[in-house]
């Protein structure tokens, strides 16, 4: 290894071969930023494809109870039923003028939805039937029923 003697050997290249201190500061700042992004940053690839729509559920899940009152809850057949997409959940209210309200909750297919939100008289004298449909999972269960009441 040879050493240079004379004026060329004593001449310093300066801090990292920079000719001015602002250039050195910018370079140090750039190095710090790159190091911080490598240490703390995460590489997230860019997806240029349009987002795919969420898959439509195959079945609607509904609450099923064959005999229910507000005071006592479900008395007969508490269960879950599945119905194809496009169908609905239903709650039938059988009421009379004294305030009695007996309910039946179930699934209803598209073909059976002709009486949607319909009030009609019952075969039992003094009672009428009100049907209430909804189209979200478990929208007819007792906790959610009030949220979907028109």
Curated annotation (Swiss-Prot):
Domain UPAR/Ly6, first and last residues per copy: 60-150
Post-translational events: N-glycosylated.
Glycosylated residues, chain numbering: 96
UniProt-annotated location(s): Secreted
Annotated keywords: Disulfide bond, Glycoprotein, Secreted, Signal
Tissue and organ expression note: Detected in T-cell lines and fetal and adult lung.
Cysteine disulfide links: 62-89, 65-74, 81-107, 134-139
Signal peptide location: 1-41
GO cellular component: external side of plasma membrane; extracellular region; protein-containing complex
GO molecular-function terms, A-Z: identical protein binding
Main location: secreted
Subunit structure, as described in the record: Forms oligomers.
Function: May have a role in hematopoietic cell differentiation.
Name recorded for this polypeptide: Lymphocyte antigen 6 complex locus protein G5c
UniProt source species: Homo sapiens (Human)
Lineage, uppermost ranks: Eukaryota, Metazoa, Chordata, Craniata, Vertebrata
